[in-house]
Amino acid sequence: MTEYLLSAGICMAIVSILLIGMAISNVSKEQYAKRFFFFATSCLVLTLVVASSLSSSANASQTDNGVNRSGSEYPTVYSATSTKKLHKEPATLIKAIDGDTVKLMYKGQPMTFRLLLVDTPETKHPKKGVEKYGPEASAFTKKMVENAKKIEVEFDKGQRTDKYGRGLAYIYADGKMVNEALVRQGLAKVAYVYKPNNTHEQLLRKSEAQAKKEKLNIWSEDNADSGQ
């Protein structure tokens, strides 16, 4: 504010001196008016430029890398469509139970995990018994997890366990998602989709569509009448 007043004062002083000089010289009224308008306009423009520059400098000095002088950070604004990032956690294999169920050592405790968003044909169901392609799905999962050097679990954003106490997660074997691999091979269907535990739903549906197109296993023609 002080610099602004100083600039305006200097301009007014210059204009006053010029006006006095023109008043005592042989200058016509027309020339006097033109020169007065020119100098007054120039003074106004100069004052506005200086004021704008000072204002910008003041605003810039209030922040430094997103932190104001009081030390508080500006809040991070997330879009309405942003999602919480999932992360994988290490586990070790105890055994593969069937196509969509494995038992792992997780955080020092044995825990049974049900693969999220997929359903494989049954092999041990008390009523359904052994369903077609059930043994193949079980063998596929068993081979995938037993041959892996690294097993990881990835929980979704919602419920982590089902009513039986089983963990609900995506299981990875050496970085490859077992859930997706089963669906891609036509050994599992996309099923039990409940928000918000559906982050990888579209990935699985894409793999399922490809398996259907290729008529793999449960989508094969010889399985069309089995109700699978």
From Swiss-Prot:
Q: How far does the signal peptide extend, from start to end residue? A: 1-23
User: Which locations, inside or outside the cell, does it occupy?
Assistant: Secreted
Q: Which CDD domains match?
A: SNc
Sorted alphabetically, the Gene Ontology cellular component annotations on this record are:
extracellular region
Task: List, alphabetically, the InterPro entries matched.
Answer: SNase_OB-fold_sf, Staphylococal_nuclease_OB-fold, Thermonucl_AS
| Principal subcellular localisation of the protein | secreted
Q: Which residues form the propeptide?
A: 24-60
Q: Does the keyword Glycoprotein apply?
A: no
Keywords attached to this Swiss-Prot or TrEMBL record, sorted alphabetically, are: Calcium, Endonuclease, Hydrolase, Metal-binding, Nuclease, Secreted, Signal, Zymogen
Does the record bear Phosphoprotein in its keywords? no
Q: Where does Ca(2+) bind?
A: 100, 119-120
Catalysed reactions, semicolon-separated = Endonucleolytic cleavage to nucleoside 3'-phosphates and 3'-phosphooligonucleotide end-products
Q: Which SUPFAM superfamilies match?
A: Staphylococcal nuclease
- Name used for this protein in its record: Thermonuclease
